[in-house]
């Protein structure tokens, strides 16, 4: 398929590949209602997601595709749960990814999307946007129906996103700390460990 994935994730008998894209949303690849940024010059303003079946010997079999706005930080920004793929992305050029303050730094923000995995096109079921305005995602972890998203610029807001209803995700709470967590690890169903750096 000639894909250079920004993130890859294996879930059971399936593999997910996410590739940063600047192309206009084409037929059969739209996230089904999620805002996109066609014609955008910045790298990674959209992410194409491909689902492959890896149960049989030989090459993986393409199953479905979808698209969401923004870019993924790593494989933990993807998670399948009960027929839905949860994806955490940042849109806008982050202040931390350019030399000096970018012109659109004030518009950068993050979001979590829930895509239905039924059918050849992954359609948008629901989303929550506006996380960490002027910031970018530093770490993500999904644990069952809950997603944890860390964004950072001067403080580290840890957002708790309730995804129990994929059609209506909502922010359940947030915790602001100095510094940021670059890695989140589930210690139990009720405990999350964050590893990162302290900020002055």
Where would I find each of the regions flagged by the language model?
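Beta-sheet-rich non-transmembrane sensory/scaffold domains
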Residues: 1-200
């Amino acid at each position: 398929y000639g894909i250079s994935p920004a993130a890859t994730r294996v879930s059971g008998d399936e593999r997910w590949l996410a590739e940063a894209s600047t192309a206009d949303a084409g037929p059969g690849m739209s996230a089904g209602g999620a805002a996109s940024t066609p014609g955008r010059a910045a790298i990674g303003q959209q992410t194409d997601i491909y689902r492959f079946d890896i149960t049989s010997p030989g090459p993986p079999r393409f199953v479905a595709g979808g698209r969401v706005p923004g870019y993924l930080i790593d494989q933990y920004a993807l998670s399948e749960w009960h027929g839905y793929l949860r994806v955490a992305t940042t849109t806008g050029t982050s202040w931390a990814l350019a030399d000096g303050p970018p012109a659109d730094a004030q518009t950068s923000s993050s979001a979590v999307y829930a895509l239905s995995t039924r059918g050849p096109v992954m359609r948008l079921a629901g989303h929550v946007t506006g996380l960490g305005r002027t910031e970018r995602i530093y770490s993500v972890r999904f644990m069952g129906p809950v997603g944890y998203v860390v964004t950072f610029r001067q403080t580290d807001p840890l957002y708790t996103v309730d995804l129990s209803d994929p059609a209506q995700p909502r922010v359940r709470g947030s915790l602001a700390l100095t510094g940021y967590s670059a890695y989140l690890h589930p210690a139990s169903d009720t405990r999350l460990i964050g590893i990162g750096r302290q900020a002055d």
